[in-house]
Design a protein with these regions (language model features):
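Conserved ABC transporter NBD signature motif
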Residues: 46-58, 66-67
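The feature captures the beta-strand-to-loop junction immediately N-terminal to the Walker
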Residues: 23-25
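Helix-to-loop junction immediately C-terminal to a conserved catalytic motif
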Residues: 38
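A short, flexible loop at the N-terminus of ABC-type nucleotide-binding domains that lies
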Residues: 1-9, 16, 57-61
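Catalytic Walker B motif of ABC-type/P-loop ATPase nucleotide-binding domains
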Residues: 144-148
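ABC-family P-loop ATPase nucleotide-binding domains
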Residues: 75-132
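Helix N-cap at the start of a conserved alpha-helix in ABC-type nucleotide-binding domains
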Residues: 28, 155-157
Length: 203
């Protein structure tokens, strides 16, 4: 992506209880849009609102921390230090979230079949995704954002992830933004799909 890349007239809303698919070719602006929505880059124009509150790189730090604590992020590659063990991730991530629940995290680690003694670098792509998801689900997030998280997963792992997302929004109070190029995943799980091309929303 060039330094001159920009988003233009992007309007994107994710309502409670929805899984919204977000599609576009590589370099179309999906990740940039997600970074803007999370307040990680400064906007030249426009505003981002999360849970009814304005959020952005120029918003007060305390406000940003509070809003981001309600968001769970799952990336295409596991971002945790490669030499840490699964059981050590809680000490790294937990303090960042006042709503972190140790029992919930331990439950997901067991449910997902993650070995607490395994190092991050030795996890398969699917297990790395599950570790991220366990973290995202352990601090009572209201919005899950997945940036190509299903890419490279085998069909069974993708099915398991989609099942978790559907269960996550089932109460009608939580939402998912699912960036993916795998249309079958979106057909199965998404309530609606938004397409971006060259920095602009197409539909």
């Amino acid at each position: 992506m060039s330094d001159r890349f920009s988003l233009r007239d992007v309007t994107l809303a994710v309502e409670p209880g929805q899984i919204v698919g977000f599609v576009g070719a590589n370099g179309a602006g999906k990740t940039t849009t997600i970074r803007a929505a999370l307040g990680l880059i400064k906007l030249d124009a426009g505003e981002v609102h999360l849970f009814g509150q304005r959020c952005g790189a120029d918003a007060p730090d305390e406000s940003q921390r509070h809003l981001r604590s309600r968001i769970g992020l799952v990336l295409d590659t596991c971002p945790f230090p490669s030499t840490l063990k699964v059981g050590q991730i809680e000490a790294l991530v937990g303090p960042a979230y006042p709503t972190w629940d140790r029992e919930t995290f331990a439950g997901f680690i067991k449910r997902f079949g993650l070995d607490p003694k395994a190092k991050v670098k030795d996890l398969s792509r699917g297990m790395g995704m599950k570790l991220q998801l366990a973290c995202a689900l352990s601090h009572q997030a209201k919005l899950l954002v997945l940036d190509e998280a299903t890419a490279g997963l085998d069909p069974m792992a993708r099915e398991e992830l989609l099942d978790e997302l559907l269960a996550f929004v089932a109460d009608g109070q939580r939402s998912v933004l699912l960036s993916s190029h795998i249309t079958s995943d979106l057909d199965r799980a998404a309530d609606r799909v938004i397409c971006i091309d060259n920095g602009s929303i197409v539909f």
